[in-house]
């Protein structure tokens, strides 16, 4: 059975991340995601991000852009990712890094694994896995 995603509306953009991350979302998680996007792609310049809830309990964000992103990762991966694949990759990097913080360790580790489960069905699975390896 495949994991389904749902784009969050304006109210859900507040309530869904709050249920998962609490008050840490607007102060630690969300800014970290944006910073990570800039680290992974020189052509990321900010902007609005869509937020998605997965029916397995996962959550991720992706830029609301029609332009793919050239990505250069710390592991040596270089390539171009669609907006959705870029968002998945950025969130996976952010969750991985934040899983080492005392307060967010359990939540971010869980979100990492839920998101990784979802990406295994993504059309760009091989590119994303290469980027996060």
What spans do the regions from the language model cover?
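Terminal domain-start segments
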Residues: 1-38
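Compositionally biased, low-complexity repeat tracts
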Residues: 18, 34, 53, 72-75, ...
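Generic surface-pattern signal
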Residues: 22, 26, 38, 42, ...
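Polybasic, proline/glycine-rich intrinsically disordered low-complexity segments
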Residues: 68, 72-133
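Amphipathic, interaction-prone secondary-structure segments
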Residues: 25-68
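Feature targets compositionally biased, intrinsically disordered low-complexity regions
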Residues: 21, 56, 65, 75-78
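Short, charged/polar micro-motifs that form catalytic or ligand-binding hotspots
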Residues: 7, 38-41, 74-81
